[in-house]
Amino acid sequence: MSIRSQQRSLHIVFVLYRYFPFGGLQRDMLRIARACVERGVSIKIFCAEWEGELPAGIAVERLPVSGFTNHARNRSFAEAVKKYLQREAVDLVVGFNKMPSLDVYYAADTCFKAKLMQERLPQLRFLPRYRQYLRDEKAVFGRDSHTKILAIAQRSVDEYEKYYVGAAQRCTVL
C-alpha cells in the first residue's frame, strides 16, 4: 500500500446561491470543481437552486431556504451552510457568492458598496436588502475577515481596497 493511498482525500465544499448552465460564474465554478475532482479532491456543491444536469462525479446538495425576498433567501442559505459546517468536517469552503463562513471567495462580482455609493443613492444602504448585501460583502472583505480572495482582475482588487482597507492583502489576481 502506497503512502498516497493511505492519505485522506481533501474535502472541499463549494457554495453558491443558484446554478444555471448559462451563467459565467456558474460555468467557472463547475470548471474549477471538475479540475479539483480530476486531481483527487472530494467536492460537494451546496446551492439553493440548481437548473440543468447534475455533474458526474460531483455531489450537489440543494439546501432548503426560506424567505419571500432574494436577500432573505440568501441569508437563509448562508445560515444553512453555517449549520452544515458546524456538524461536518471539511477542509475548505469556497464561495462563489459573498457570504459569511468562507475560507476562499472567487470574486467575479464588483464591489457592492462601491456601486451603492457611486451609482445609487447612498441612503439605500439603510434598507434591509442593501444592509444584507453589505453585511455579506463585509464578511468577506472586512477588516476582521480571514477569507482569501481570488480576483479575476486587478481593477476589482483596487475597488475593494478603496472600501475595505486591508482586503487587497488577502487577494490573489488570477
Place the predicted regions along the sequence by residue:
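An aromatic- and histidine-rich active-site surface loop
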Residues: 90-116, 129, 133, 138, ...
